[in-house]
């Protein structure tokens, strides 16, 4: 999965091969289906941007959700944005707040800013429920074989 992710990156960034968004997405999907969270994120970005020809926000949300569940803060932030806008998922300020809070807990500065904005839009009860949901969030176990070793070491706090 790691090699597939890296090959997808090469096709996306025109590194050693001719840039080809469709081939990049193909390799990202293979790696993502094996549990590579960065490939999941990049595949979601490809769906969201229309890099493969047509935007598919529901698929973007699905892949952002999977990577977010594996603890990737960039995907947590992007998933929160989708919930806030109702883009590819039903609009839910509670879910947006939850995912911003989870990403903010990992140090994501943009998520911290969005939390401040959403705090003014949610009532105290809703905000407390979203905070409780975020506080209880356990990232799913990360497959060591599907992710880059430094990624696993960082997740484990090593």
Role assignments for model-derived ranges:
Residues 1, 13-15, 20, 28, ...:
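Short helix-capping/linker turns of helical repeat alpha-solenoids
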Residues 4-13, 40-49, 53, 76-85, ...:
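Hydrophobic face of amphipathic alpha-helices that form TPR/SEL1-like repeat modules
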Residues 22, 58, 121-124:
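Soluble non-cytosolic domains of exported or imported proteins
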Residues 26, 62, 142:
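Extracytoplasmic cell-surface/polysaccharide-interacting catalytic and binding patches
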Residues 46, 58-82, 145-158:
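Generic detector of solvent-exposed, compositionally biased contiguous segments
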Residues 109-158:
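Terminal, low-structured helical/coil segments at or just beyond the last alpha-helical repeat
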């Amino acid at each position: 999965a790691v090699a597939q992710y890296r090959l997808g990156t090469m096709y996306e960034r025109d590194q050693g091969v001719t840039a080809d968004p469709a081939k990049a997405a193909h390799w990202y999907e293979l790696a993502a289906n094996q549990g590579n969270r960065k490939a999941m994120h990049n595949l979601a970005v490809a769906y969201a941007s229309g890099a493969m020809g047509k935007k598919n926000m529901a698929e973007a949300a699905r892949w952002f959700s999977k990577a977010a569940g594996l603890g990737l803060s960039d995907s947590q932030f992007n998933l929160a944005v989708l919930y806030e806008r109702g883009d590819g998922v039903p609009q839910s300020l509670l879910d947006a707040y939850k995912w911003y809070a989870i990403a903010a807990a990992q140090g994501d500065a943009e998520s911290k800013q969005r939390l401040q904005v959403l705090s003014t839009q949610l009532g105290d009860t809703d905000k407390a429920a979203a905070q409780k949901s975020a506080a209880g969030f356990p990232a799913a176990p990360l497959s060591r074989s599907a992710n880059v070793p430094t990624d696993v070491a960082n997740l484990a706090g090593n």
